[in-house]
């Protein structure tokens, strides 16, 4: 299926999730809102959705058929990763570019949530100070500005 909205730099696709499982990855983190493409979530026509009906309308207007034809499942990447005990961490943010392409100790401290399967975490990378790429500018977050 050709999906003009597919961009592997912006979201994880089903083949990518399977690749993580096949390569025995234990956890994967993302600096984005969700592991799955937004049209695989309840923002579109899945689960209790759509909570953003305009994205379904815009997709159909642009491609001539409902988004659900191309994105039929609800959060398939979540399902693949969770079913195989691969931890997925979304919304990492921060200065990730300063520590990419190197090994470091990563810890995620979750809220205690009895019987929960997901929660926010305090994500921490322990990196020796001499290995931080100081040529990368600090990330700034202008909260409240759109």
Describe the role of every protein-language-model region.
Residues 1-146:
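Active-/binding-site microenvironments in catalytic and ligand-binding cores
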